[in-house]
């Protein structure tokens, strides 16, 4: 009996790696004088996959930096999508280029000079292109990008979004790949809305103003943020994803209404007074664009941003209010111009959509009157095309729809060209 069991053990085959015999595993694969079981194969596969992901992340980072477009190439790309704002585009092109070159220096980990991070503050009216510029940059660089509304943020422990949710949104954009998130861009809109109520420290708690600024300081400067995996809530027993925000580029933006008045007061206080004062110069009203271009950190402090917060945003650039001509160009010229978008939409119904020059000028004028900038253009066009977009899918034999100034000005019905050269107007209320 004992001899039989010895013979059986000798006839069994064993995994050369874990030592389990063929009866203890599902599969045992034989090689020249070596065996490997299915469990060891899975373990090896997991190790290789993990190493490959790590290597791919490093390679991906290096590739992004090695193939980084030059500043003039970045600006040229921005020109294709954003009309005007040439100075701001130049500032952003240089800032983004330097930021990602800095990462290359950081990854080399040499004993050379350590380069600081330069986050950006964009100041400009509604619809001037702040968000579009940031989105276009992120697409060009192929990095994760997220937009957060500063008005939804509160200090930790209060009702509202914790500031670390900003990083969680960025992680969601890249499927919780931490290395990719650490190369991303965070755009915080409406940053002017978290200004404290006065430039004097308040004894009452300002959880959605100065409190949020304080909470954002470390995040923007660079810290190790602990983020719950897969968007879960924080609790002490769980493991957190550690995200280093030192290499994340933060772009903050806002309209900063009334900031021009603060700048104007400062400039007026610096002018000569008394009999030698230049009365003519004093009477001249300076434009808002001119005043904002003279903005200094002290003006932003008076507005309600704390000095430490301004210090984390060393690059400040101003976007001009868009003129009527600029809005006309926005409607027609960029790659994703609104007119082109609606023409493509109508092409899906095999119908050509045409706007004459006068109608486009009137649409731009309406946006100027509404003080909505480029952001208001889409809602104006939607209103103009509502009836025809409602009727069109049910109509047949339509070849072309013509939009002229009367359609824009008095909301009259557009002209319809039928396939058999019949001309009718769209039905509508």
Curated annotation (Swiss-Prot):
> Could you provide one GO biological process annotation from this protein's UniProt record?
proteolysis involved in protein catabolic process
Q: Which InterPro entries match?
A: AAA+_ATPase, ATP-dep_Clp_protease_ClpX, ATPase_AAA_core, Clp_ATPase_C, Clp_protease_ATP-bd_su_ClpX, ClpX_bact, P-loop_NTPase, Znf_CppX_C4
Q: Which Gene3D superfamilies match?
A: 1.10.8.60, ClpX chaperone, C4-type zinc finger domain, P-loop containing nucleotide triphosphate hydrolases
Record: residues binding ATP: 125-132
Question: Per its UniProt entry, which superkingdom is the organism in?
Answer: Bacteria
GO molecular function terms listed in the Swiss-Prot or TrEMBL record:
ATP binding; ATP hydrolysis activity; ATP-dependent protein folding chaperone; protein dimerization activity; unfolded protein binding; zinc ion binding
User: What does the entry list as the binding residues for Zn(2+)?
Assistant: 15, 18, 37, 40
Q: Which residues form the ClpX-type ZB domain?
A: 2-56
Entry keyword set? ATP-binding, Chaperone, Metal-binding, Nucleotide-binding, Zinc
Q: Is-annotated flag, keyword Lipid metabolism? A: no
Presence of keyword Zinc: yes
A single cellular component GO annotation: HslUV protease complex
Sequence similarity: Belongs to the ClpX chaperone family.
Q: How does it assemble?
A: Component of the ClpX-ClpP complex. Forms a hexameric ring that, in the presence of ATP, binds to fourteen ClpP subunits assembled into a disk-like structure with a central cavity, resembling the structure of eukaryotic proteasomes.
Query: What function does this protein fulfil?
Result: ATP-dependent specificity component of the Clp protease. It directs the protease to specific substrates. Can perform chaperone functions in the absence of ClpP.
This one is known as ATP-dependent Clp protease ATP-binding subunit ClpX
